């Protein structure tokens, strides 16, 4: 019986990255032997055991055979006669197929160390194409390690392109697809994840709403990058540089889906695209089982980002209606999220990457003033029932109007 540290822990150690989880592989043991040593079996589909003290996972060496569609269409064979190399052969990428024995020696039958040094994401064997989830995993690794200079090996990209043309991708469950998306949204370069999926052809299969944005033009005056798909990737990149909140990043990703619905004869204009995108976002979120928190913010950003951009032109009544509709009174954190997404939208354009966004300070000032209106004072003044709400609304409009005047005066003083 031999125990090896495998997978991400070995890879990340070689990359001098912090190690989050350790996975171990056991060669030459049976489930009965593991249980006699105090390990507790937890794996249903294949033998995985928890260490009696550390609770870390130890999996028996195994091989896999394709028996059906999808990432779950495999039968596993775990036996004491399965070798280290046979187990590593079933893994996705060479950089994930390196093992370390208990003496610290590295076992690298598929040259993963060389690929780490060359910054290459390369598949281990042709069996890579049997698991459609690997298309998403490689895209996620490309995004995760983009800052380290990793690229997908040409032969691996060719395999991913072939896989995207088969029915395998459609066999993936929404939960597994979203799991990979969510992990990518939490990484440093989520835009790379979607760029890779587009490059291999998986984007139009799994996320047709996003793929449809590429090739849709926007007015060059406001969007020097012109292409809506490119703009969307730039906005997503901007959002990830500003916040780690995955809900904001998701909202940035889908804020312009309505532009794909604009009639070609109206291009490059996209009137009402924010509202047109609402049913598209709802459909996408329902299909992928997107969490309600993400969906609700995405709908808000799509619906209101044009209003936020035009904040200085909005009447005070319209600003209060925006606050009411978004329920900022009970969820003030959503205003911050909305503004972050709008800043990302504004800066996600060629040449505008460092542009100031005074609309954010202005709307924050409006909300602070409106939220400080004292309801108790209104009640004390004798208002009752529905009159209280009307008086509160009028007072909020009044204080926002004052903020508006103060802002205009301060801007006038700054203008030479």
From Swiss-Prot:
InterPro entries: CCA_bact, HD/PDEase_dom, HD_domain, NT_sf, PolA_pol_head_dom, PolyA_RNA-bd, tRNA_CCA-adding_enzyme
Catalytic activity from the UniProt record: a tRNA precursor + 2 CTP + ATP = a tRNA with a 3' CCA end + 3 diphosphate; a tRNA with a 3' CCA end + 2 CTP + ATP = a tRNA with a 3' CCACCA end + 3 diphosphate
GO molecular function: ATP binding; CCA tRNA nucleotidyltransferase activity; cyclic-nucleotide phosphodiesterase activity; magnesium ion binding; phosphatase activity; tRNA binding
Tagged with keyword Nucleotidyltransferase: yes
Ligand binding (ATP): 8, 11, 91, 137, 140
Cofactor, free-text remark: Magnesium is required for nucleotidyltransferase activity. Nickel for phosphatase activity.
Top-level taxon in the UniProt lineage: Bacteria
Record-listed E.C. numbers: 2.7.7.72, 3.1.3.-, 3.1.4.-
Cofactor: Mg(2+); Ni(2+)
Binding site for Mg(2+): 21, 23
Residues where CTP binds: 8, 11, 91, 137, 140
Subunit relationships: Monomer. Can also form homodimers and oligomers.
Protein's job: Catalyzes the addition and repair of the essential 3'-terminal CCA sequence in tRNAs without using a nucleic acid template. Adds these three nucleotides in the order of C, C, and A to the tRNA nucleotide-73, using CTP and ATP as substrates and producing inorganic pyrophosphate. tRNA 3'-terminal CCA addition is required both for tRNA processing and repair. Also involved in tRNA surveillance by mediating tandem CCA addition to generate a CCACCA at the 3' terminus of unstable tRNAs. While stable tRNAs receive only 3'-terminal CCA, unstable tRNAs are marked with CCACCA and rapidly degraded.
Domain observations: Comprises two domains: an N-terminal domain containing the nucleotidyltransferase activity and a C-terminal HD domain associated with both phosphodiesterase and phosphatase activities.
Family statement drawn from the similarity comment of this UniProt entry: Belongs to the tRNA nucleotidyltransferase/poly(A) polymerase family. Bacterial CCA-adding enzyme type 1 subfamily.
The protein's name: Multifunctional CCA protein
This protein's encoding gene: cca
């Amino acid at each position: 019986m031999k125990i090896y540290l495998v997978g991400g822990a070995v890879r990340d150690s070689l990359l001098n990255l912090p190690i989050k989880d350790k996975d171990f592989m056991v060669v030459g043991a049976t489930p009965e032997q593991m249980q006699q040593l105090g390990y507790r079996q937890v794996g249903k589909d294949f033998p995985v055991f928890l260490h009696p003290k550390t609770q870390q996972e130890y999996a028996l060496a195994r091989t896999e055979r394709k028996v059906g569609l999808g990432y779950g269409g495999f039968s596993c064979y775990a036996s004491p006669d399965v070798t280290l190399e046979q187990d590593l052969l079933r893994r996705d990428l060479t950089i994930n197929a390196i093992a370390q024995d208990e003496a610290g020696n590295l076992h690298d039958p598929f040259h993963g160390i060389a690929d780490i040094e060359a910054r290459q994401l390369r598949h281990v064997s042709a069996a890579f194409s049997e698991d459609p989830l690997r298309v998403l995993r490689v895209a996620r690794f490309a995004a995760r390690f983009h800052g380290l200079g990793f690229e997908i090996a040409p032969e691996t990209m060719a395999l991913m392109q072939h896989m995207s043309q088969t029915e395998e991708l459609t066999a993936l469950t929404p939960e597994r697809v979203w799991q990979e998306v969510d992990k990518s949204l939490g990484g440093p370069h989520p835009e790379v994840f979607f760029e890779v999926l587009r490059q291999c052809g998986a984007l139009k299969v799994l996320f047709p709403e996003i793929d449809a944005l590429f090739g849709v033009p926007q007015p060059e005056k406001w969007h020097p990058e012109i292409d809506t798909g490119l703009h969307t990737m730039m906005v997503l990149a901007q959002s990830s540089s500003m916040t780690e909140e995955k809900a904001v990043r998701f909202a940035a990703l889908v804020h312009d889906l309505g532009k794909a619905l604009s009639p070609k004869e109206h291009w490059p204009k996209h009137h009402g695209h924010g509202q047109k995108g609402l049913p598209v976002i709802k459909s996408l979120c329902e299909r992928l089982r997107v969490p309600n928190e993400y969906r609700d913010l995405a709908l808000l950003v799509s619906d209101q980002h044009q209003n936020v951009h035009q904040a200085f032109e909005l009447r005070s009544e319209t600003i209060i209606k925006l606050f009411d509709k978004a329920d900022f009174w009970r969820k003030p954190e959503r205003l911050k999220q909305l503004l972050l997404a709008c800043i990302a939208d504004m800066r996600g354009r060629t040449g505008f990457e460092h542009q100031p966004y005074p609309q954010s300070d202005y709307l924050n000032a409006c909300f602070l003033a409106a939220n400080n209106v004292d309801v108790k004072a209104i009640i004390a003044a004798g208002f009752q029932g529905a009159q209280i709400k009307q008086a509160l609304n009028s007072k909020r409009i009044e204080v926002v109007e004052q903020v508006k005047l103060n802002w205009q005066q301060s801007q006038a003083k700054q203008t030479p």
